[in-house]
Regions:
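PP2C/PPM-type serine/threonine phosphatase catalytic domain
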Residues: 1-146
Length: 146
């Protein structure tokens, strides 16, 4: 199976594309950097996807453990870069950090996938047999949940 992923940024001039996507043999994922708060959202999005585990994240505890294992090198590099940018950027980084949503789908076999999402990014799956479009949110009302 051949995979392809592309993230198209907003057309405004000077607008940073804060989103990241991957499509590999057994995983597809999207991370939507939330640039309205914090710094380096585009970096955090890419970092999350580049450090996804090979096996599915199945619980909040597993998500916390995974983030706990990967965050420090990212933080240290961004802290250094914010320091170079100056005091206001460093203060903003300390106060707000970086934000991004995440949705990932792991292919477990030819007939089974497992997905997880954090935030409001959504994975869609079209079931050819049932002709139903499935998604990682149960209902549209789920978007109103914190």
């Amino acid at each position: 199976m051949r995979s392809f992923a592309n993230s198209i940024g907003k057309p405004e001039q000077g607008c940073i594309n804060e989103d990241a996507v991957i499509a590999q043999e057994n995983i597809i994922a999207v991370s939507d950097g939330a640039g309205g708060g914090g710094l380096f959202a585009e970096r955090w999005s890419a970092y999350l996807l580049n450090h996804l585990p090979a096996t599915p994240i199945s619980s909040a505890d597993e998500l916390d453990a995974w983030i706990g294992d990967i965050w420090e090198p990212y933080y240290n590099q961004c802290e250094t870069d914010a320091r170079i940018l100056g005091g206001l950027s460093l203060d903003k980084f300390y106060d707000e950090g970086s934000f991004a949503t995440l949705v990932a789908v792991w292919r477990l076999s030819d007939t089974e996938c497992q997905w997880m999402s954090f935030g409001d990014s959504v994975a869609f799956h079209y079931n050819y047999r049932t002709k139903q479009l499935e998604h990682s949110f149960g209902t549209l009302a789920d978007f109103d949940k914190p």
